[in-house]
A protein has these predicted regions:
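Short coil/turn segments that connect the beta-strands within blades of beta-propeller domains
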Residues: 75-76, 119-120, 158-159, 203-204, ...
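Beta-strand-rich domains and repeat architectures in extracellular enzymes and scaffolds
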Residues: 57-89, 105-116
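Signature of short aromatic-glycine-proline-rich micro-motifs recurring in repeat-based ectodomains
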Residues: 68, 196, 243-252
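Conserved beta-strand position repeated across blades of beta-propeller domains
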Residues: 72, 114-116, 155, 200, ...
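A short helix->beta-strand "capping" segment at the edge of beta-propeller domains
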Residues: 45-64, 95-98
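C-terminal motif of bacterial Sec signal peptides marking the signal peptidase cleavage site
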Residues: 31-32
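Conserved beta-strand positions in repeat-built beta-propeller and related beta-rich domains
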Residues: 80-84, 122-129, 161-167, 208-212, ...
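Surface loop/turn motifs at the tips and blade-to-blade linkers of beta-strand repeat domains
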Residues: 59-64, 104-108, 143-148, 185-191, ...
Length: 277
């Protein structure tokens, strides 16, 4: 409780504290991507993840006051959930202009996290309040549900919800009760991947930001194995980076148009990218 109170009093400590993790997390990912697996007869074959390249297809403006925690594109609407104490909102964003229509503002005591749309409901996590807010598609509050631990990223396969909490695990959640139905432990080349953050379901796989890095990993939800990854280092150019610009975070998939969008916390741009081997 004391640590949470400090975070509430000093919101800037959140970014500073988490940034200290970046070198450690990036080092783990580099080792996972480059090291050779140990060979032993009793060890199952380790999947070699595919390193995908990307190209930028289009660039759109993004509100530099939006600390992006969740992003989703559904039926022509770009949904965004943002964080920071006293600034967390759920909003709809006009893709072309970047203008946001705020639908609801969270209490000052809540730090907004991942969002997802499932059917006629929108779900929005909170970081340390152990609470998910449920809204209708107009942003009207319907109910809250409780969960154990922190909330980070959220996505859906069309039936169930999947939630990350900043660890190596992704939990399958019942959308009606928000009770845990299963757990996926994420591994890359046999090594656990920590700090799983924002999530997006794309063609039967879970795409995830790895917090404090420029990596997006592609996870098999049946096994937890990382089958591929994209390194977005350099996506946001140096001239677009300010003192407030934070890490890559936010993946949205336009299923009908086959488009993938990525952005970051307090970034001035949102990118449509094409992924290639």
């Amino acid at each position: 409780m004391f640590a949470e109170f400090l975070l509430y009093l000093f919101p800037n400590i959140v970014t500073s504290m988490k940034r200290l993790l970046s070198i450690m997390v990036l080092s783990v990912l580099v080792v996972a991507c480059s090291s050779q697996p140990k060979r032993a007869a009793s060890v199952p074959q380790i999947v070699e993840p595919i390193k995908y390249a990307y190209s930028v297809k289009a660039i759109y403006p993004h509100d530099t006051t939006s600390y992006t925690q969740g992003l989703q594109y559904v039926d022509g609407v770009l949904w965004e959930g943002t964080g920071e104490w006293g600034k967390s909102v759920l909003q709809k964003v006009d893709l072309q202009s970047g203008r946001a229509e705020v639908l609801t503002t969270l209490p000052r005591s809540e730090f907004g996290e991942g969002i997802t749309v499932l059917g006629d409901k929108v779900y929005q996590l909170t970081w340390t309040n152990n609470k998910v807010h449920v809204y209708d598609l107009q942003g009207r509050h319907l109910k809250d549900m409780r969960y154990v631990g922190e909330g980070w990223g959220l996505t859906s396969d069309g039936e169930s919800l999947y939630m990350s909490n900043g660890t190596t695990d992704i939990y399958k959640m019942d959308p009606e009760t928000f009770k845990r139905e299963g757990k996926i432990t994420v591994t890359m080349r046999g090594e656990a991947v920590n700090f799983i953050n924002e999530l997006e379901w794309i063609d039967g796989r879970i795409w995830a930001n790895v917090y404090t890095t420029d990596y997006v990993i592609i996870i098999n939800p049946q096994t937890g194995v990382v089958e591929g990854y994209i390194d977005f280092t350099g996506l946001l150019k140096d001239e677009d980076v300010t003192e407030r610009t934070d890490v890559l975070n936010g993946i949205a998939y336009d299923k009908d148009g086959g488009r993938i969008f990525v952005t970051g916390k307090l970034w001035n741009k949102l990118f449509e990218v094409e992924i290639n081997k």
